[in-house]
Amino acid sequence: MSDIKIGIIGGSGLDDPKLMKDKKEKKVKTPYGNPSSSLTIGKIDDVDTVVLARHGKGHSIYPTGVNYRANIYALKKEGCTHILATTAVGSLREKIKPGDLVFVDQFIDYTKHRTLTFHDEKVIHTPMAEPFCKDLRSLLSKSAKELKLRHHPKGTVITIEGPRFSTKAESHMFRSFGADVINMSTVPEVILAREVGICYQTVAMSTDYDCWKEGEEPVTWEMILSIMKRNAENVKKLLLKTISKIKYTHCDTCKL
């Protein structure tokens, strides 16, 4: 469908010229400042696609410093109707192993210093009971099954401020909250996407067990990078297969 345009947030590798046709770089400015990176625009499987690096092209922006409003505004202005956002997460559950994919359906906001809305001048209470796009989640699960990838069709992510990792006490507390995975980037990204009416779904890759699990080495940045590099090709294949399905799908459930 010609009105479908997919935004990809995160380091997915989909800006590879072999995958993205008619590729071009576009620098944009927004009323909220500059986004984290230029937009890489092109077509994947004949679907208009826009790739944005959340933490900058060289991963130089820490989670609190990401200009989430500029990022989402830039994708909305570019005409994106859907967003697939990749992220590394720590597992808070035994069953979610390093390397597993999780298509989260709920979040808990444990951030402290982030702007959570576009609405600075008027009071808007955005419905958030179902914050992620169930249609995208279904397509991702279908694609993961076809590719025989270990995945979990739903889960709750808790987003912390960072950039430090959790203490053991915090990790156990987050488990008691009902969170399944932990990261530093989903909030406020998902909230802002809902405010502008974009279908949004997180593609979370488990890289570690945070620090709650006895007998497991506490998470380090090096550990995260190692698992991500090892599974990058799986994420790329998943996104490619899912994008080919989205072009036949138009979701109205995420529109306000």
Annotate the PLM regions:
Residues 72, 171, 187-190:
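Generic hydrophobic/aromatic pocket-lining and core-packing "Φ" positions
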Residues 81-82, 180, 199:
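Short acidic/polar active-site loop segments enriched in Thr and Asp
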Residues 211-256:
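His/Asp/Glu-rich mid-to-C-terminal helical/loop segments that flank catalytic regions of hydrolases
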Residues 131-176:
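Active-site rim beta-loop-alpha module in soluble metabolic enzymes
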Residues 76-79, 175, 194:
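Non-catalytic positions within long, well-ordered alpha-helices that form the structural scaffold/packing
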Residues 184-222:
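Zn-dependent metallopeptidase/amidohydrolase metal-coordination segment
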Residues 1-128:
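Metabolite-binding pocket within alpha/beta catalytic cores that recognizes anionic/polar moieties
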